[in-house]
């Protein structure tokens, strides 16, 4: 049984790795994003917006800004990766995004890394086999680099990361 987005958020909050937004507009954001996505929205994305995650470690969440009046709404961040069948959910702070896959149909969507170098044309590598697993991996990212963990350390947290269909795991991406 896999971990849910809410469970992952609770784990990370208990560790002090997760910071929440205090905006309180989750329902409006969910409605607005669902409309932008043509009426369909992955359950994990909805769960992330309900959790109102602002950041995990140094990684900022991409939270759409809700506007009550439709004429005040802007395209915003939601549309940045739609050409690549994804929705941006986190920034790496260097202009790149982690995006939740929208091309997975009825399967639980994976998370991929999108590089600004190619204008986010395609996913470069798999960042998590599910949104919940991705959140746990993201919280370990900087520590893993500092410790010099070997390639594939991610499998200890996300045993299915190397099975993501649209891009290889980071240690296989080259």
Predicted feature descriptions by range:
Residues 1-99, 103-105, 145, 163-174:
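A surface-exposed partner-binding patch
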Residues 102-107, 114-116:
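Short, surface-exposed, charged loop/turn segments at secondary-structure junctions
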Residues 14, 20, 104, 133, ...:
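Generic detector of low-complexity/intrinsically disordered segments
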Residues 121-123, 133-134, 147, 154-165:
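Glycine-rich, aromatic-bearing surface loops/beta-hairpins
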Residues 59-61, 126-130, 153-154:
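Short, charged/polar low-complexity linear motifs in solvent-exposed/disordered segments
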Residues 112-145:
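Compact, glycine/acidic-enriched structural inserts
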Residues 97-100, 108-110, 121-123:
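Short helix/loop capping segments that flank catalytic or ligand/cofactor-binding pockets
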């Amino acid at each position: 049984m896999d971990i849910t987005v809410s469970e992952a958020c609770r784990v990370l909050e208990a560790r002090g790795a997760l910071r929440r937004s205090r905006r309180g507009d989750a329902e409006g954001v969910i409605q607005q994003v669902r409309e932008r996505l043509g009426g369909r929205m992955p359950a994990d994305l909805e769960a992330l917006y309900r959790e109102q995650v602002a950041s995990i470690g140094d990684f900022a969440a991409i939270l759409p800004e809700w506007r009550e009046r439709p004429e005040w709404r802007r395209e915003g961040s939601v549309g940045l990766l739609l050409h690549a069948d994804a929705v941006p959910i986190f920034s790496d702070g260097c202009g790149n995004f982690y995006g939740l896959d929208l091309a997975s149909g009825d399967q639980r969507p994976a998370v991929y890394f999108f590089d600004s170098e190619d204008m986010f044309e395609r996913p470069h590598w798999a960042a998590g086999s599910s949104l919940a697993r991705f959140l746990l991996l993201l919280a370990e990212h900087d520590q893993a680099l500092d410790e010099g963990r070997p390639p594939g350390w991610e499998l200890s947290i996300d045993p299915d990361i190397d099975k993501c269909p649209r891009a290889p795991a980071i240690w296989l991406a080259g």
